[in-house]
Each structure stands twice: as structure tokens, then as C-alpha cells.
Amino acid sequence: MFKITRKGFTLIELLVVIAIIAILIGLLLPAVQKVREAAARMKCQNNLKNLGLACHNLEGVRGGLPPSSVQSPSVIDIPGLKEFQKSGTTGTLAAHYAKHCFLSIILPYIEQGNVLKQAGGAYDLTQDWYAAINRSASGTRIPTFECPSTPFGHSFSTSSLSAAEQTTYGAGWTLPTADYMAVNRSNNRAIIWTTMGLTDPGVNSDSIKGVLASNQFTRLLSVTDGLSNTIMLAEASARPQDRRLGKLANPLAGGASPYMNGAWAHSGNDIAIDGSNAAGSTLSAAADVPTACRVNCTNQGEVYSFHSGGANICMGDGSVRFMSESVSLKALLTMAARADGNPPSE
């Protein structure tokens, strides 16, 4: 009688199988990551489209696009900001106007009625965004304001701030963040424009203001460079962290920090697109122009994302584009200004 023996895998065969599986995983993982990032980038673009649409829906009701921010308005701006006047004040001083950013102002136009009711009533634009009546709503995460590609946790605690800031904004309060900012102006240094061979639009003129400007509702006709040629919103991801060239430059905001405006409701949620030098600082001298960094250089006041090769922007007409890191400085600065008069450049 013959005895039948079962032959199993030898150690070498098992190791070969494991090696093949490891190779397959190594080949498939980058593909999976690319698909995941493509989906995140598309979601990010859809968020910007919704925000752009909300701005235009408000324009249809109000007759102007929303202010990028309302804080410390000038005497010239005050007459157009009556809906932000604090109750019980005469409305004659800058301090009589509540502080808000465009994201708070467009809340009713992005179907966020539930957020407006968090404090037991409508979000009150006549009180500062951090006032007690608005704190519950301001402390609520809104997915439309967040890009899924951003690795930062989309919230931070006021406990990380200085004692003075905690006195102003409240202690132990968790603030949700936003990855999208309004572009309120372009570079305001004449030397930068003339070094690039462009006409200086005037450092204090309306020409360098963005589609959404500080302390004023923008009439569409004032965007003389064309809505489709001018940036309205852009990614400036991961604030309040200080990110430079893909790396964390400083830890979470603390002390007397300018990065508090990572909170989505913060009245400083607008950026001036200036371009930056290699250190991540604003361009201020002619020598900075040849080596200027344009996109994904720093998230402190510039266009910044965690997408490979560029960042998403929303134009004045509501269309969304992917701006490459290789965009020229000329194109970037002229696209940030609504009426500089210089022809579009690529």
C-alpha cells in the first residue's frame, strides 16, 4: 500500500510569495495615494466653487461682493457698513463696528442655517465674531471651509495663545480653522511692480485692491481688469501653523502671534498676495524679484496648499482654477489686483 504525502510550501517558496506581495503593494500604494489626492483636490475645488457662488449670491442681494474683512474701518468706509454697527453706538468711530471676515458674512448663502442657530439665534453681525452670542457658532466646524488635503487637525485651542489674547478671545475655547482666504489686495510696493517692468498701480489706490476688499462691499463694475482675470479666493492652508516650503517653521500659534487668524471666523481671514522671498518674507526690494517664490512658499499671507505642484484659486467670476507653482510673479501680482491696468500675464 502506497502512502500519499502532501507537499507544503518550502521556506524559499514562502519567502518568494511574500516578496511578490510586497512588490505588488509597493506598486499599488502610490496609485492609491494618487487617487486619494485627486479626490481630495476635487473636493477642495468644489468647496471653493461653493464659496464663490455664495459670494455672488450675496452680491445679488446686497449689490456688492462681501468685504474680505470688517475691522477698524476708515471714515470713508463707515457709511457702507451699517449692518455691522454695534447696537448702542453712534456709528461714528471704527470701534463702533463689529469684527468679521467674509466667511461669517456669507454663512446664510452656503446653507449653514444650523450653524447660525447654534447660539440660540442668528449669527449676530452687530457683535464681534468672538462675542458670547456668536461663540457657539464660531466654534463649530464647517466642512466647506476645510480642504481634505490639509494634514493639520482643523482646530486649535485658545489655551495655546498668550494671556492677553485669551482675555480678548476667551480661554479654553476650541476654534475650528479654514483653508480658504479672501484675496484683499496685491503687492503695494512700487519697486516690485517697476522692477518687473509693469506700471505701478499706486500703493494706496483702489487699483491694487482685490475682488474682495477690506471694509467695503465691491461693486462688480469696479473690477475693471475683469472678473475672470482676477483672483477672489485662494487656499492658504494649515493656519495657525506657520508653514514654509512644505515644512513646519514654527509650532502652533502662541504668544502675541499673528497666526490667530487661522480660525475661520477670525476677522483677519484675508490675505494680500505679495509673493515671498526664499525665507518666506514679503517681497519688499528689487533684489527679491528674480528669486521670488510665488505659490506654496508660505501660508502666512500667501497662496499655499498641500496639493502637489500648485494650489486652487477661485476667480472673481466664481470659476475655480489650479494655479501652478511655476506661475510667473507678474501673473500672480496682476491677477491679485482688480484694476491695476496691466495686461494678464502667464
Where do the language-model regions lie?
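Surface-exposed loop/linker segments characteristic of extracytoplasmic
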Residues: A40-E346
